[in-house]
């Protein structure tokens, strides 16, 4: 049976995705101290749904967006590399490519034009992941 670790399972996307996945799904709370020590050895998949998208109170800083959307991605990816899991899935955002209305269709080859700290931090995470080398047996 597939064992999936779902990061951000309490958020909007993660909470909706969790019930749709097959196999055993474990929500991982990275706000818990030493959360890395609780990663099961037999996990097959890491799914990252962690993200800071909104600033409802008007108090979020650039650092807040980059920490949640970029720095934590690097931490999760390093944990993935150390684990026995084979698959890392990162959920990004259209904002990493475009945040304004565009007449042409967006494709994988579209040049990114993020405007906000949210979009820029999501784009930075995508670029980081695309530059990483994967050992044999991981994707």
Segments predicted by a language model, with ranges:
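Conserved Rossmann-fold NAD(P)-dependent oxidoreductase catalytic core, especially the SDR/UDP-sugar
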Residues: 75-117
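NAD(P)H-binding glycine-rich loop region in Rossmannoid oxidoreductase-like domains
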Residues: 36-82, 96-100
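Rossmann-fold NAD(P)-dependent oxidoreductase module
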Residues: 16-20, 79, 128
């Amino acid at each position: 049976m597939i064992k999936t670790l779902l990061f951000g399972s309490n958020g909007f996307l993660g909470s909706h995705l969790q019930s749709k996945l097959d196999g055993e799904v474990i929500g991982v709370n990275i706000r818990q101290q030493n959360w890395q020590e609780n990663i099961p050895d037999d996990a097959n998949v890491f799914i990252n749904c962690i993200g800071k998208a909104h600033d409802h109170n008007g108090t979020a800083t650039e650092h807040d967006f980059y920490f949640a959307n970029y720095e934590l991605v690097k931490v999760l990816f390093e944990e993935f590399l150390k684990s026995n899991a084979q698959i890392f899935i990162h959920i990004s955002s259209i904002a990493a490519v475009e945040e304004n209305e565009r007449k042409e269709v967006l494709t994988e080859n579209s040049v990114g034009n993020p405007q906000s700290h949210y979009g820029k931090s999501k784009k930075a995470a995508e670029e980081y992941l695309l530059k990483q080398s994967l050992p044999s047996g991981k994707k």
